[in-house]
């Protein structure tokens, strides 16, 4: 996914980006 979880947490991988969000 992307290095910035707040960049596109809903657009990219939810299991890798917004995991922490």
Swiss-Prot record:
The alphabetized UniProt keywords are: Apoplast, Cell wall, Secreted
What protein does this entry describe? Pseudogermin
Signal peptide residue numbers = none
The answer, when asked if Endoplasmic reticulum is one of the entry's keywords, is no
Q: Where in the cell is it found?
A: Secreted, Extracellular space, Apoplast; Secreted, Cell wall
This protein's assembly is summarised as: Homotetramer.
Q: What does this protein do?
A: May subsume the role of germin at the low water potentials during embryogenesis.
| Keyword Transcription regulation annotated | no
Q: Which family does it belong to?
A: Belongs to the germin family.
Q: Which GO terms describe its cellular component?
A: apoplast
